[in-house]
Amino acid sequence: MRVIGLMSGTSVDGIDAALVEIQGEADAIEIELLGFTTYSYPSKLREKILAVCAGEKLSALEFAALDDEIAHSFATAARQLQERYGKAELIGSHGQTIFHRPPNGNLGLSWQLGRGEAIAQQTKLKTVSNFRRADLAAGGQGAPLVPKVDAYLLADPTKHRCIQNLGGIGNVTYLPPKNQTDWENYVIGWDTGPGNVLLDLAIQKLTNGAQAYDQDGIWASQGTPHLDLVERWLADPFIEQLPPKSTGREYFGVDFLEQCWRDAQDLQLSEADWLASLTEFTALTVQRNYELFLPQLPDEIFLCGGGCRNSYLRKRLQAAFGNQIPVRSTDDLGLNHDAKEAIAFAVLAYWRIKEFPGNLPKVTGAPCPVLLGEIHCPY
């Protein structure tokens, strides 16, 4: 089956669209990436999404209009992908997260805009959306949802692997070797903290919005991290919170960054030193989470997501783990690091119509496996 996966993460960089050929049943699947592109949001829409993520209030009418505008962009991305790579049979659309609140004595909340019924109508393709709601309703975090896909596509027969996503938020999937008895039951994953979000927000602050991100981490690489300040930031409660755990821009967002800026100003750090310190903090949140919560450190780490293109961040991650644990890209495993999340939601959509649960209770904290996603059929 030819399935489109659509994904826009917390960085709001654009809509990643992957056309994937999927064969097999349940966990015995094979995939082939047929085509991939990133559809850029119209600039005004991106600005609106970021403003809402930062807390801008909307009326009910404005909220509904934004939902429809995002759905139109997702449908456009799916149509453009098919014009280039051929017709699909199914769409799995993650949508655009604008708010995520983990469970805290009550059910968690996670809002993804870009309603699936509108995408189905505009593309004339069956569409699966709202993947997080069933897990949240069962009492889980609703995130991360990719670890089960990672397990069946990227686990190694003999090596312990970590798949580290560096989107706006960072998250890890730990994969034990497949030669271990009941290895699937030992797959774990959680959000590690910030990925690109603080680095991107910092660049936007320093350039008054003229620059969206630090290409290759060049600006940050010109500075020196202030290690005492980094350690102070690492004392944040989320870093040492036991998994299952998830987070978003609501936590690691503008307010968090402004406190980091005030801290840097108090120490009279240069802009480059501040960026270097934020990069070091991001790298060490990953290392600290592994050290605290993995059953053992991995034999190898594979990166995916936008942060994979930040050469300086990759360098600092490698330094954090030393020479004993290689830090590479999922490209080395034959899985495009930019397309990986979109591929995952294509697989989750395929699993949904095959009635195969897509969550891992040990990862999300849900009490049981559940079917992920709501199915919308065009008329």
From Swiss-Prot:
The lineage of its organism: Bacteria, Bacillati, Cyanobacteriota, Cyanophyceae, Oscillatoriophycideae. It comes from Picosynechococcus sp. (strain ATCC 27264 / PCC 7002 / PR-6). This is Anhydro-N-acetylmuramic acid kinase. Catalyzes the specific phosphorylation of 1,6-anhydro-N-acetylmuramic acid (anhMurNAc) with the simultaneous cleavage of the 1,6-anhydro ring, generating MurNAc-6-P. Is required for the utilization of anhMurNAc either imported from the medium or derived from its own cell wall murein, and thus plays a role in cell wall recycling. It catalyses: 1,6-anhydro-N-acetyl-beta-muramate + ATP + H2O = N-acetyl-D-muramate 6-phosphate + ADP + H(+). InterPro entries: Anhydro_N_Ac-Mur_kinase (IPR005338), ATPase_NBD (IPR043129). Keywords: ATP-binding, Carbohydrate metabolism, Kinase, Nucleotide-binding, Transferase. ATP binds at G9, T10, S11, V12, D13, G14, I15, D16. Gene3D superfamilies: 3.30.420.40. The gene is anmK. It is an enzyme of class 2 (transferase). Pathway: Amino-sugar metabolism; 1,6-anhydro-N-acetylmuramate degradation; Cell wall biogenesis; peptidoglycan recycling. CDD domains: ASKHA_NBD_ANMK (cd24050). Its EC number is 2.7.1.170. One of its GO terms (biological process) is amino sugar metabolic process. GO terms for molecular function: ATP binding; kinase activity; phosphotransferase activity, alcohol group as acceptor.
